[in-house]
Every structure is written in C-alpha cells, then in structure tokens.
Amino acid sequence: MGNWLVNHWLSVLFLVSWLGLNIFLFVYVFLNYEKSDKYYYTREILGTALALARASALCLNFNSMVILIPVCRNLLSFLRGTCSFCNHTLRKPLDHNLTFHKLVAYMICIFTAIHIIAHLFNFERYSRSQQAMDGSLASVLSSLFHPEKEDSWLNPIQSPNVTVMYAAFTSIAGLTGVVATVALVLMVTSAMEFIRRNYFELFWYTHHLFIIYIICLGIHGLGGIVRGQTEESMSESHPRNCSYSFHEWDKYERSCRSPHFVGQPPESWKWILAPIAFYIFERILRFYRSRQKVVITKVVMHPCKVLELQMRKRGFTMGIGQYIFVNCPSISFLEWHPFTLTSAPEEEFFSIHIRAAGDWTENLIRTFEQQHSPMPRIEVDGPFGTVSEDVFQYEVAVLVGAGIGVTPFASFLKSIWYKFQRAHNKLKTQKIYFYWICRETGAFAWFNNLLNSLEQEMDELGKPDFLNYRLFLTGWDSNIAGHAALNFDRATDVLTGLKQKTSFGRPMWDNEFSRIATAHPKSVVGVFLCGPPTLAKSLRKCCRRYSSLDPRKVQFYFNKETF
C-alpha cells in the first residue's frame, strides 16, 4: 500500500480534492438552506427535503461541469505533450481520464437520485399543504396570492385539485428533469463494459444523449419553483418575528405584512457554459482535422481477419503508442472508432491494424476485401496521446499485449528498430521484456517479420539481450502441441519461425516479475499493458508485490492502455 501511494500520490490527491469539493459544496448549501431566514417559510412546508434538493442540485451542476473535461482529447494530448519531460508521477492522472470520467458520472447518478427523491417529497408536501384545511402556517402560506405581484407565490401547486404527478410533469423543472434523467440512465447503462465491448455502436449513439442532458440541465431552473422570501418583505416582516402571528397578517396597521416570495434565477447554465464552449471548440477542431484528405497507400489482409491500412495525410505527425479515431462514411457517417497506430514515427506513412470485433469492423473489413475501385473514403481524427508514449522514459520496459492488444507495442518496437538503424545511442531504455498472449497461431503471423528483423538487428549490433520476448499460445490443441514437441530441437520455432520458442498456456507472472526484479535490482521498470481487466488486475498486483519500499531499489510502475 505504501509503495502504491508513492507511485500514485498525485492521482490520490486529485481524487481526494474532487471528493472534498463535493462534500464541501453539499454541506455548505445544505446548511445555507437549512438555516437561512430567507427560506424560513419554505422550510415550513418542505422541511429538510428543501436543503437536500438544493445541495444535490449544486453538486450536480459542479459535476456536470467537470465531466466533459476528461473527454477533451486534444486538451489531454496538449497537457501530455507539455508534461513530456515531467516525472511519470505527474503525468499519471492524465492516464486515468476515462476512470475519472466514470467516477464523475457515478457521482452525478448519486446526486440525481438524491435530488429526485427530495423533490418527490417536496411535491407531495406542496400538495398536502395546499389541500390542508386546518389553518396551519403551511396551509396559509400555500394559499397566499398577491394580485399586484402575480408571481409572488410560495406553493407552485395553486389548486387542491391538482395532483402531484400532474404538477411534476407539467412544470418546466419536472419535465426537463424527467427527460434529463432518462437520458442519463440510457447513457450510464449503455456504457457498461459488456455493452461497450460487444455493442460499441449502441454505446456510441446513446452516449450522444449528453446533448439532451446538458440542454435540459441548462433550462431546468427557469420555472423558479424553489422560492424564498424577498429582501424587501423580510425587512418589513421578518419571519422569525412574524411566523407566530400568521393569523393576524395584514389585519391591523401594526401587524406583520404577509410575506412576498421570489423564485431563484437559473444557475446551471453558469456552471456548464465554459466547459460547453471548450467542448464545442474541441469538436470543431476534430471536424476540421477529420475533413482533411486521407490517402490509403496499402491494404493488407492478415490471418485471423486482421486488416492493415497504411495511410498518408498532409500535416500528420505522430508519436509512439498514439491512437486515432477512424470513420468510414460509406458504412456509417456518424460512427468513429479508436485504433492504436502500429507504424513508427520514422515511417513515411501511418498504419492501423483492425480485427473483426463488431458490426462496424466486420463491415469495414468486408468492404476492403471486395477490392472495389476506388477505395472507400476514410476519415481520420488525431493522433491522441496515451500512456504508451512514456515507454522510452523507463530504464527497463515490460510490454504485455493480449491478442490485437499488441498494436501499441508494434509502434514502439518499430521505432526501436529505426533508432538502431540510424545509430541512435541516446536511448534511456536499456532492456525490453515483451510478452504477447494469443489464442490462435495465425495471430502471430503479421508480427513475425518485425520480431525477426529486431532479432537480427540486435545480433549485428552486439546487443542480443536488449530484447527479450515471449509468445504465449492459449488456444492450442493436442495436434499443435505434438507438432511443436516433435520439432523442439529445431533452431527456430515451428509455429512462428523465430528463435524464441512459443510457450503454451499463460505466463506465470510471479516467476516473470521475480526474474526481472532480480536482474534489475536498482532499476525503474515500466510495465505497459494493452489487454483485458483481469490481466490488468494480475499485473497491478505483481507491480505492488515486487516493488521495493526503498526508492533506491527496483520499482515497478503499472500503466494500462485505455481509450
């Protein structure tokens, strides 16, 4: 735990600050509405539910302002580039942007639930006080009406015949609240891991309901349902002095005047205006870049239905491990899908590898398999930075890819090859451990040439130990295993043709980390993963377990690719 805090102290500080701000805003507004004389009469009808509704509303505004920032990809790429020479701990929060985005969304859900429940109680109490015939203060307040000031009422339910449901669904606040809540529920449920992985199109389209959510939030307070006593009225008849003699209001010259009330002006738009403006600028920038012409220079179909596209685009510059968003208008005009760049910055083109994993990718692969002329138009937005850009910042790098998750490391390994070709000897990275876990033997095919070239290059430069790679096959059968066993004495692997033999099963991570820690007792080791959450959990545990509490000894820093 201590080592984890050392590695993530800035992320923890940021998270604690955000939680602290939520708690402060909630408590501050709650106490204000619970104690303020301005809402003395409002509390007579609504009780504590008033303060709960208003406190949760402010926290909703705050988090609705914050939630757009983590998905402004250009801003994050700019900050990552600005912090490229900073300590990796300072860049760590940028790598958790989507995690923070989800946490803010969960917080919005919590405060939405509090806000809805509180206002359901409020409408019920408004209705009861309007129907009450007992002459209580609440019933008197509900019947107040000033002809000279038609909007100086306290109870939004003006008639005892109006039901709670009718009042809730016909008011601006009630109607916009229902629409915003439905949009929020659809966005949150469609963002679940299972749906996002298997039905990305559903997630993509549904998530754009945030536009409706933001619009409803902006106009939610226009009705001014929550009302407080006016300053002028309080100066004439202070509630703490006059509430006990409410039966005598306006009867005598010296008696208290009946109070006047005013609704609160809408405030939500003030919170969301700046991030909305920033997000609109972000979208305009994305649109401008996506409209620039992309030339497809080469199309390669690899085994296991993996499509490689090599492209060029004017003014396109990339770094290792970055990703782009791709759109094919002939398939879907609105859908944009993220793909990691597999080319190196030193190459004259940029490339991506696409595996069939859903309707959109299957349609794209099918389109290119048909080899129509001319080729379908491709639009590209990016590139955007990720945690994989930091690979060269570590003395020792451990790269772990699962299936198509190897793509970020293809860019890195290609760049290494080019750097050694050009006698680039200023690399901070002195050792690379590369692990690739695949279900099918065909998946290794498109990566073999690169690994083979790296093997030869390292041998020629006298650095055969610079790259240590292990390939693991998890989808093998008895025929494959028997064939490999019969040819075990061959100089090259029977499945891949590489010097390193393919292993069957999954890596024993404790053994691997123990070996690396022993080989590099005083090094800073960066562990990079592009793979499933279960594998991330195992690697994260190993990083904590094998990192020394002594900062002068081996330290493992876990980094997971997310986009």
From Swiss-Prot:
Pull one GO CC term from this UniProt entry. plasma membrane
* Cell location: Cell projection, Invadopodium membrane; Cell membrane
Enumerate the catalysed reactions.
NADPH + 2 O2 = 2 superoxide + NADP(+) + H(+)
Phylogenetic placement of the source organism: Eukaryota, Metazoa, Chordata, Craniata, Vertebrata
What cofactor is this protein dependent on? Answer: FAD
Residues that span the membrane, as ranges: 9-31, 45-69, 103-123, 168-188, 207-227, 396-416
- Signal peptide range: none
GO BP terms: angiogenesis; cell chemotaxis; cell migration; cellular response to angiotensin; cellular response to hyperoxia; cellular response to interleukin-1; cellular response to mercury ion; cellular response to platelet-derived growth factor stimulus
The task this protein performs is described as: NADPH oxidase that catalyzes the generation of superoxide from molecular oxygen utilizing NADPH as an electron donor.
List residues of the FAD-binding FR-type domain: 283-390
Q: Which residues carry this modification: Phosphothreonine?
A: T429
Q: Which InterPro entries match?
A: Cyt_b245_heavy_chain, FAD-bd_8, FAD-bd_FR_type, Fe3_Rdtase_TM_dom, Fe_red_NAD-bd_6, FNR_nucleotide-bd, RBOH/FRE, Riboflavin_synthase-like_b-brl
Q: Which residues lie on this side of the membrane: Extracellular?
A: 32-44, 124-167, 228-395
Cytoplasmic side residue ranges read 1-8, 70-102, 189-206, 417-563
Q: In which tissues is it expressed?
A: Expressed in vascular smooth muscle cells.
Protein name (database record):
NADPH oxidase 1
Molecular function GO terms recorded: metal ion binding; NAD(P)H oxidase H2O2-forming activity; small GTPase binding; superoxide-generating NAD(P)H oxidase activity; superoxide-generating NADPH oxidase activity
